[in-house]
Amino acid sequence: MATVIPGDLSEVRDTQKVPSGKRKRGETKPRKNFPCQLCDKAFNSVEKLKVHSYSHTGERPYKCIQQDCTKAFVSKYKLQRHMATHSPEKTHKCNYCEKMFHRKDHLKNHLHTHDPNKETFKCEECGKNYNTKLGFKRHLALHAATSGDLTCKVCLQTFESTGVLLEHLKSHAGKSSGGVKEKKHQCEHCDRRFYTRKDVRRHMVVHTGRKDFLCQYCAQRFGRKDHLTRHMKKSHNQELLKVKTEPVDFLDPFTCNVSVPIKDELLPVMSLPSSELLSKPFTNTLQLNLYNTPFQSMQSSGSAHQMITTLPLGMTCPIDMDTVHPSHHLSFKYPFSSTSYAISIPEKEQPLKGEIESYLMELQGGVPSSSQDSQASSSSKLGLDPQIGSLDDGAGDLSLSKSSISISDPLNTPALDFSQLFNFIPLNGPPYNPLSVGSLGMSYSQEEAHSSVSQLPPQTQDLQDPANTIGLGSLHSLSAAFTSSLSTSTTLPRFHQAFQ
């Protein structure tokens, strides 16, 4: 059996004790058994002594791995704390002003500005406010130094320079001269000394002339970040407030269900060239449909009509009538009738050629027979006069819109060849609806209508322009095909002359 010496029992018990997280009141702090050989400081661990030794050698083994960052640190903890500044996420938020910070100590220093018990000191000469009395007295001393007065405003002592006066003001701020830090970091290019290495690096821009901080509003450059921040608050305060108030997701100008006048909706579209309109990707609520009617009639079972605003190039955005403001409702000059041809909106990602084909298939399916054509033509002759009279009233309102002309001109290029798409257009189209013309309106008189009904040409040749593959020439032939097929029906007289 093993024997245990009573004298060693206490040592065994001490080694078996589980170390507690908190020290008791009677216990003293751990001894600093690791003194520095170069100074009088001592530390309680080898790691802290090693970190301290870097202050004597100038070594900084922990370097930042970012490409444009040249900072290095004496400990791994300080490097990790610095790496948070390269992250776009700021996790520490102020509860008073919602300002975000990368580090917790920066937030803690910022919270002192929101202390309600702290009085502010306002300068009567320039109106600036200061949170600390020391900063306020320094500011007053600067005003006195600029005027040539180097006397202390508290004890009326005179000094030889402004720097000595500012050092003296610290004694009146409740700080003893012994507690003042030593400026042990000296600049390599001048005699100035600073408290920290950070202040030295910030001062170096005076000698290097580097200006790495660019203002995003006026392209002015600065050597220090605090100078850029001061410039932004002073010169671009309105821009900063505008950025804070804007939402994250900007509204698309073509977003539907917005009660905006149609004229206002057309402005952002009309300001764009046609090449940008063709290359711009459309949202799911905006379809490219060259043959959409401006108004889509619903079923007659009491359902409300859905208004479709006709944009240039046939871009349509359905707007519910309930969501439109009463002041924005359109006054329809021509009522809905059986000639309102309802066209189904194509799928979201259907190409342009597929849209035209599906539309033409619907036209072929909805065209009446030849016998019904003759009956429709005879009945349309009877009701032609009142229709012409109603159109004559709006002759001044209906004209070729400038928007359609300005958009069709850039499309007259050889690159946009849609001639193959129009080869299979049927000769028999739906009856003419004055509302389906959209923005392409024409004006004519009543006397011209009777003469043109009886003397319509069978077909008109295309405009022989090699550069204009599509444009007014193809639209001219397309309109002639419809007018020749409908003969004396309710088509608009001299429809082809509007595109000559």
UniProtKB/Swiss-Prot annotation:
Q: Where is this region: Disordered?
A: 1-30, 365-388
Cross-link (Glycyl lysine isopeptide (Lys-Gly) (interchain with G-Cter in SUMO)) at which positions?
A: 244, 263
Span list, region Activates transcription? 243-500
Expression across tissues is: Expressed in fetal tissues such as lung, liver and kidney. Not detected or weak detection in normal adult tissues, but highly expressed in salivary gland with benign or malignant pleiomorphic adenomas with or without 8q12 aberrations, with preferential occurrence in benign tumors.
Q: What is this protein called?
A: Zinc finger protein PLAG1
Q: Please give the subunit comment from the record.
A: Interacts with KPNA2, which escorts protein to the nucleus via interaction with nuclear localization signal. Interacts with E3 SUMO-protein ligase PIAS1, PIAS2 and PIAS4.
Other noteworthy facts: Residual nuclear import after mutation of the nuclear localization signal is assigned to zinc finger domains of PLAG1.
Could you state one GO cellular component term attached to this entry? nucleoplasm
Which species is this UniProt entry from? Homo sapiens
